[in-house]
Amino acid sequence: MFKVNEYFDGAVKSIAFQTETLPATVGVMAKGSYEFGTSQKEYMTVVSGSLTVVLPGSDKAETFTQGQTFIVEANQRFNVTADVESSYLCCYE
């Protein structure tokens, strides 16, 4: 069954599911800046909109747009800014 998650007072919502190979979530972010933590390695693909990300170990922001993926290792924290309402697919390894 699906599990619905809500973060940052409802500004970020996701639905967890199992792909053929990995657990995943598909979600949406309202405009804003957020800090996330990982417990597993995450492959995050922007489905629509754009996300500006400061990855662990970097102080440089990178912008990812539709179809682009970034990777965050397990047990890390990272910052994301959504300049517009955006959606994503995140697979966990």
UniProtKB/Swiss-Prot annotation:
It catalyses: a purine D-ribonucleoside + phosphate = a purine nucleobase + alpha-D-ribose 1-phosphate; adenosine + phosphate = alpha-D-ribose 1-phosphate + adenine; cytidine + phosphate = cytosine + alpha-D-ribose 1-phosphate; guanosine + phosphate = alpha-D-ribose 1-phosphate + guanine. Its EC number is 2.4.2.1, 2.4.2.2. Keywords: Glycosyltransferase, Transferase. It comes from the Bacteria. It holds the Pfam family Ppnp. GO terms for molecular function: guanosine phosphorylase activity; purine-nucleoside phosphorylase activity; thymidine phosphorylase activity; uridine phosphorylase activity. Transmembrane segments: none annotated. GO terms for cellular component: cytosol. The keyword Transferase applies. Catalyzes the phosphorolysis of diverse nucleosides, yielding D-ribose 1-phosphate and the respective free bases. Can use uridine, adenosine, guanosine, cytidine, thymidine, inosine and xanthosine as substrates. Also catalyzes the reverse reactions. PANTHER family: PYRIMIDINE/PURINE NUCLEOSIDE PHOSPHORYLASE (PTHR36540), PYRIMIDINE_PURINE NUCLEOSIDE PHOSPHORYLASE (PTHR36540:SF1). Belongs to the nucleoside phosphorylase PpnP family. This is Pyrimidine/purine nucleoside phosphorylase. It comes from Cellvibrio japonicus (strain Ueda107).
